[in-house]
Amino acid sequence: MAASALSRACLKEVQPVTGLPMTQSAPNSNDEAAFPPPGQPVMGRINRLGLWTLYMKEVRRFFKVQLQTIWAPAITTMLFLVIFTIAMGRGDREILGVNFATFVAPGLIVMGMMQNAFANGSFSLLGGKVQGTIIDYLMPPLSNLELLLGLVGASVTRGVLVGIAVYIAMSLYPGVDLTLHHPWAVVWFGLMGAIMLSLLGVLTSIWAEKFDHNAAVTNFIVAPLSLLSGTFYVIDNLAPFFQSISRLNPFFYVISGFRFGFLGQSDIGDTNMAVLHGALGLGVLNAVLAVLTYLVLRTGWKLRS
């Protein structure tokens, strides 16, 4: 009897205590910050990581073959300077108060920037369509604006790198003086030209279905507009009719404005205000091109169909 009573007492002692709050681990604030509530978007308005990844992908693509994409264009542009200065005479002829080599060098620098920005922008989506890898651009969680920014940013980067390479090469050429008079003009017109051709390149890559289409735009639109934009001459030497046509060419304002940054003089107009008007006009033109490219990209024309 005593043993049974003792066992009953022990059972009563080991019974769980009820009514007391169970111990719980305190919530971790870091976990709450890492995992948002259900239904709340994980990414913000801009997918910064995705945008940066796309940009670096495009930069690494042309940097892997930098001899072809950066240094070869720099050498080709340098050959223009050598050939034209030898043909025209290095020290006998002056334009805008400087020798011919100093006059033509800034135009060649920004021309190289624009042409290579176009080459990079016109290849990305077209290469994806031809090689069957266009899905790599369309499937990631990137908006149309982010896709456009990544492509244009990489194209501008290539243009700037080519411009720096050409600048260094031409600075070493005898008779060339590339002293900066208006740094803001060099930066603004250089970037506006690179952005303009990058946007045109993206539009071309959307429209083109094969590399022949891309080459046609390069040979029949970009190259003529570049070479007939006052790179090797001032438009004041042209007949009034052709001067009016040249002033309708946006490449003319890029090249003459960029040259103004080095020489302090330009054939855009007789005053610095004319250069400012050209700078604002390029800004408006690029804004219109950016909106147009975005709208075409958003429709998925020739990309998703």
Predicted features along the sequence, with ranges:
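Extreme N-terminal basic, low-complexity initiation segments
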Residues: 2-7
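Hydrophobic transmembrane alpha-helices and immediately adjacent juxtamembrane helices
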Residues: 8-184, 188-305
